[in-house]
Amino acid sequence: MDFTGVDSRYAPNREEARVSTQQLILSLVLATMVFSVALELRVEDFRRVAKMPRSVVCALIPQFLLLPVATWAATLALDLPANVEAAMMLVAACPGGSLSNFVTHYGRGNTALSVSVSAVASLMALVLTPFNFGWMMAANPATAAWLREIALNPNDIWISLALMLAIPMALGLSLSHHRPRLAERIRKPLGNFSLLALLAFIALGLVAQRHLLNAAILPMLAIVVLHNASGLLLGWLTSKAMGMSEPDKRAVMIEGGMQNSGLALGIIAVQFNADLGMVIIASLWGIWHIVSGMSLAIYWRKRDAGLAG
């Protein structure tokens, strides 16, 4: 596979120092994105967990344990550029957001389970996203060496991510609880603004490096497809092993295969200066997991219709 264009070892010279204003803006965009996610969370989402704890745990296992471990093992086995491996690890460390709720609902899975899992995962991600990303990067010789080359300390990344996620999440949860009407009114505009701002920044970076993209897109898409399929498979295997009902299996499978690529892109922009290889992996994930998730949902709906007929 040809990764020359996106391998950070062969990337054209870049400015060594980030522009502080740009970094501040990107940090604020990421914080706004996390804040808007927190505005969606409701107390009822967490109360439902007490009614189906086994199903919630079943859905969390592939997200926070199996997919990160499988991703780390895959990066050790594959000879990929360190920045590509780092992107795979980061995506695996970012649990899915509200999009998985829609796909689960459309596929006639257990929507209540999906919503509750997303709520719990959003809080767990405050600690486990930086933790999982940190240990995977440190336990892979190639990515650990790459971090040293670009002068990034894994502990600094952990602390920075925890703060960037925890503070806006706490503020969003507080506003959602104390001022629910205001939270509902500003949630969509803030979410749309932060996502569009992030995508605009990423798009400008991709356009500037478009001459490097052609050779790398297909092999990187293949990596994303296989990575996503692994998440879906791990979700299915976990739910089957724990004897879940069919609607629960669908919810767990979707939660296992849909990751928060938007959060991953935000972290890449802020922490890794929008590294091209990492951006491509996370961007392709953002597209492909919708394709695979909706394909499954459509298949399930058609199968249910056939059984009903």
Q: What residue spans do the PLM features occupy?
A:
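Alpha-helical transmembrane segments of multi-pass small-molecule/ion transporters
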Residues: 2-309
